[in-house]
Amino acid sequence: MHIHIRNGRLIDPGSGMDRTDDLYLAEGKIVSIGSRPDGFHDDREIEAGGMIVCPGLVDLSARLREPGLEYMATLESELEAAVAGGVTSLACPPDTDPPLDEPGLVEMLKHRARNLDQARVYPVGALTQGLKGARLTEMVELHDAGCVAFSQVDAPIANLHVLMRAMQYAATFGFKVWLRPQDIHLANHGVAHEGEIATRLGLPAIPVCAETIALASILSLMKETGASVHLCRISSAEGTALVRAAKRQGLPLTCDVSINHVHLTDMDIGFFDANCHLMPPLRSLADRDALCVGLMDGTIDAICSDHAPVDEDAKSLPFAQAESGATGLELLLPLTLKWAVENRLSLPEALARITFHPARILGIETGQLAIGAVADLCIFDPDANWVVSHTELRSQGKNTPFLGMELYGRTRFTLIGGRIVYG
Amino acid sequence: MGVHPQLNKNGELQHLLTTEGLPAVILRHILDTAESFTGVTERDVKKIPLLRGKSVFNLFFEPSTRTRTTFEIAAKRLSADVINLNMAVSSQTKGETLLDTVDNLSAMHADMFIVRHNQSGAAHLIARHVRPEIHVINAGDGWHAHPTQALLDMFTIRRYKQDFHALRVAIIGDILHSRVARSQIHALTTLGVPEIRVIAPKTLLPAKVERLGVHVYHNMVQGLQDVDVLMMLRLQHERMESAHLPSTEEYFKYYGLTPEKLALARSDAIVMHPGPMNRGVEIDSEVADGTQSVILPQVNFGIAVRMAVMSILAGN
């Protein structure tokens, strides 16, 4: 299949390329930029005038809810949502039912995803059996089955001895450990940021120190074990400062933030809006602003959607009892564009945080727009506006704090390995 | 959202969910209306037909005797049909969701729901969900709000102290877990009380509580100085299990209201308690039963205040 993409604004965040030109794809790869290769016959031409052509988005946290939680979402629904959002690669965390803690489950997931032939799925394996924080999983086996890293997701290990051993063991084989810094005892079943809003609403609160103390432990254990760590969904100003200092010391550390936390604060909870029940909790305005600064200065490498489709019933409960999480695959692009506009960041810089940087963290070759690169592409209209609604969202989860909001940026075509999977 | 959670589009009370953001004019209207009902409660068994033909559902997902009973009495004095549902042992344990329960009861032509739930925001959730002709009264949700308790407290203060603008009020005890304290603070603020104090150990104060407009004290000797109104809070025994406090004995020693500590307040200060009391834990019997205590009148005013709230809602 030879595809000729005409007149698009080509943005390659990795190299900084940003120019309007033609792109030629063949055998699943980018074969030329600008000039038509000899003997290239268009099987398909895409007119991309006024549109942006960039690497497909790479999402570091997208729950697909399989196996076991199909009442919330299925692979079919969520991978369709992914490509509709321009996401071509995604890491799925192991908090399924059962958790991704044995090779058979991972192989099954990979197999199902391959058959659907939509976005590329990179499973993150459980660091401990059943995510219980006690016994290690067979990481090598899981790696061979397709796991790209190991994580506890939202079930932090309480016993630091176990965490140290897990990091040591992962480091033995060069596996990356993905951790969301949160001390389980300090979090104490809280559901909102400890501050004025939680105080007014009478909600059990999670103090910032639940993040910073866990972070300090992780940083010490990195030095002790030599493990390389990716920090998931940091939420606070103080946490960002710790990451900045650790990176200056040269620790092998990367970090992401959820797109929700880039835009929202605990004030958005309003009168107990369960769509704002997220983990980690939405924090204060000062925290959100510090996260944005951290994103701009490179302390935070990537933005993830933290996609978590939740069924209507599980959200129609009092705030603390409502299931946490928000759907996000289809919002990652427009909300990143919104963030870029608000912070006067150039498009290549903003897109780097959802393409090139997360691809490097995942250790995959996509995320660039260069000759010879795999043709995973997102072609979007930056000026197309749409209103987030139940009907617009393809994800089975309609739960998002952004319902009803008008956003700019709509994916027109998504290509994976040179094949049009959306558009 | 954007829609006000408890006022209708004319700015009238549609539900009573919290005292926060409740306009002073509505607050005073409730107190004035309650005043007009005190005669009724004292005249005994004389019914008023304001809620005749209306069905009031007492929806208590958490055990309560006093609050549920006063709501029931108030509704009956207004001639309403009262249906008591003890949800703690009902459909919820059979797996029915909160909103399913509400839908089923709405289908039985409920006009008003009185809701008590252990989760903050439960009454808001129900109020957002029900048909517009149904009114919801929050009878206590988690740690968040207990507006009718706060209103009856305001009624009591007005009875004994008249002018809110000249008062120093202290709220003493477990502020962190108290829906009563939160609702009191907002009501007192709206009614113009210039100085509200909270007195508690740091473990029983929520973060940034000063942002609610209160002065924070950790010491009863300083905190009770020149106070006109003392509002005691109930201490739950589980606070000892969760490392908030070492023992009830030590708590009583430093924060229990004894005659000696009461003597630090103004000589005409009144002592209040939302009940049920733990004698010897947060309050000494001598104070609870003493001349400055207005704890029993509080209970009585509770009926008039709840009649006022129900009749105002039914009229809107």
Swiss-Prot record, chain B:
InterPro entries, per the entry: Asp/Orn_carbamoyltranf_P-bd (IPR006132), Asp/Orn_carbamoylTrfase (IPR006130), Asp/Orn_carbamoylTrfase_sf (IPR036901), Asp_carbamoyltransf (IPR002082), Asp_carbamoyltransf_Asp/Orn-bd (IPR006131)
Sequence positions that bind L-aspartate: K94, R179, R234
Binding site for carbamoyl phosphate: R66, T67, R116, H146, Q149, G275, P276
GO biological process, one term: 'de novo' pyrimidine nucleobase biosynthetic process
Sorted UniProt keywords: Pyrimidine biosynthesis, Transferase
Pathway named in the protein's UniProt entry: Pyrimidine metabolism; UMP biosynthesis via de novo pathway; (S)-dihydroorotate from bicarbonate: step 2/3
EC number from the UniProt entry: 2.1.3.2
PROSITE patterns named in the record: CARBAMOYLTRANSFERASE
SUPFAM superfamilies: Aspartate/ornithine carbamoyltransferase (SSF53671)
Top-rank lineage group of the source organism: Bacteria
GO molecular function terms attached to this record: amino acid binding; aspartate carbamoyltransferase activity
Catalytic function, reaction form: carbamoyl phosphate + L-aspartate = N-carbamoyl-L-aspartate + phosphate + H(+)
Pfam families in the record: OTCace (PF00185), OTCace_N (PF02729)
Enzyme class: transferase
Keyword hit for Cytoplasm: no
GO cellular component: cytosol
Family affiliation: Belongs to the aspartate/ornithine carbamoyltransferase superfamily. ATCase family.
NCBIfam families per record: asp_carb_tr, PRK00856.1
Description of how the protein assembles with itself and partners: Heterododecamer (2C3:3R2) of six catalytic PyrB chains organized as two trimers (C3), and six regulatory PyrI chains organized as three dimers (R2).
Function: Catalyzes the condensation of carbamoyl phosphate and aspartate to form carbamoyl aspartate and inorganic phosphate, the committed step in the de novo pyrimidine nucleotide biosynthesis pathway.
Descriptive protein name: Aspartate carbamoyltransferase catalytic subunit
Organism of origin: Nitrosomonas europaea (strain ATCC 19718 / CIP 103999 / KCTC 2705 / NBRC 14298)
Phylogenetic placement of the source organism: Bacteria, Pseudomonadati, Pseudomonadota, Betaproteobacteria, Nitrosomonadales
Gene assigned in the entry: pyrB
